[in-house]
């Protein structure tokens, strides 16, 4: 049984993320979506919110499991005896960072491969940062996120504006 890890902050989970999950889940027996507790990035959604959102969107995939992790990715990968780390590459701008991370992961985890997947054409330009910025300015992000995520964004932005 081959287990893969797809790590990220998923702040918020977009249709691009789901596209990668859908495709990667067909390649592996088990895919664990690792929602990073990235305090350094100062996420818009709390870890608990990101876990809930991810489970809402991805819960229908029978071989996909969502859970949080903190600390080094290598420890999370080892804990699950995963053989592959899945990463998405949207553009050339992603490549340098992802290439460096893959090299470091290979050094730390010599028996684990990093698999890069490019998004489907309609999702190549989507990022959580762009989605949050558009939503915060009152723009329509419904083509980039699932309805439940759109609702979460609107509620969180409204609460911040009131608070």
Curated annotation (Swiss-Prot):
Name of this chain's protein: Phosphopantetheine adenylyltransferase
Primary location group: cytoplasm
Pfam families recorded: CTP_transf_like
One cellular component (GO) term of this entry: cytoplasm
Site feature Transition state stabilizer, where: 17
Gene source species: Herminiimonas arsenicoxydans
Family: Belongs to the bacterial CoaD family.
GO BP term (any one): coenzyme A biosynthetic process
Job of this protein: Reversibly transfers an adenylyl group from ATP to 4'-phosphopantetheine, yielding dephospho-CoA (dPCoA) and pyrophosphate.
GO molecular function, one term: ATP binding
Quaternary structure annotation from Swiss-Prot or TrEMBL: Homohexamer.
Source organism, top-level taxon: Bacteria
EC number: 2.7.7.3
Catalytic activity field: (R)-4'-phosphopantetheine + ATP + H(+) = 3'-dephospho-CoA + diphosphate
Keywords: ATP-binding, Coenzyme A biosynthesis, Cytoplasm, Magnesium, Nucleotide-binding, Nucleotidyltransferase, Transferase
């Amino acid at each position: 049984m081959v287990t893969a890890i797809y790590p990220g902050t998923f702040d918020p989970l977009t249709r691009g993320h789901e596209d990668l999950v859908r495709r990667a889940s067909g390649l592996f027996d088990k895919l664990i979506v690792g929602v990073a507790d990235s305090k350094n990035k100062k996420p818009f959604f709390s870890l608990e919110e990101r876990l809930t959102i991810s489970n809402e969107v991805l819960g229908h995939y029978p071989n996909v499991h969502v859970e949080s992790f903190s600390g080094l990715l290598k420890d999370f990968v080892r804990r699950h005896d995963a053989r592959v780390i899945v990463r998405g590459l949207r553009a050339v701008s992603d490549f340098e960072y992802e290439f460096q991370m893959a090299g470091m992961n290979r050094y730390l985890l010599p028996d684990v491969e990093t698999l890069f997947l490019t998004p489907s054409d309609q999702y190549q330009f989507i990022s959580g940062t762009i989605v949050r910025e558009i939503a915060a300015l009152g723009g329509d992000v419904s083509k980039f996120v699932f309805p439940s995520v759109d609702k979460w964004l609107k509620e969180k932005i409204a609460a911040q504006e009131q608070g």
